[in-house]
């Protein structure tokens, strides 16, 4: 893990079955959306998915594909929480 996660985020990663490589990929390639309260939300919109398909080896892309609904919330450089999107986000 190349990121700093809060205790809450670490627990949510485990509870929600999200591997740490998904969060690494979100940090490196994910789209940043602001929540207008000081936090940033990282997601995998279609443009990012297309970029990943072209940049990652096929086996890594396939492993990541089932986690494209994941998001991470960052505040002051620390991951606050993670989860799976169940509703469409504006702009996606």
Enumerate the predicted regions with their spans.
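Ribonuclease/tRNase effector modules and their secretory precursors
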Residues: 1-92
């Amino acid at each position: 893990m190349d990121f700093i996660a809060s205790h809450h985020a670490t627990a949510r990663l485990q509870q929600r079955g999200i591997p740490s490589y998904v969060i690494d990929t979100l940090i490196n390639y994910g789209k940043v959306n602001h929540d207008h309260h000081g936090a940033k939300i990282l997601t995998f919109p279609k443009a990012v998915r297309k970029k990943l398909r072209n940049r990652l080896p096929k086996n890594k892309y396939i492993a990541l594909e089932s986690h494209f609904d994941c998001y991470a919330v960052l505040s002051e450089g620390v991951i606050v929480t993670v989860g799976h999107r169940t509703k469409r986000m504006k702009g996606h």
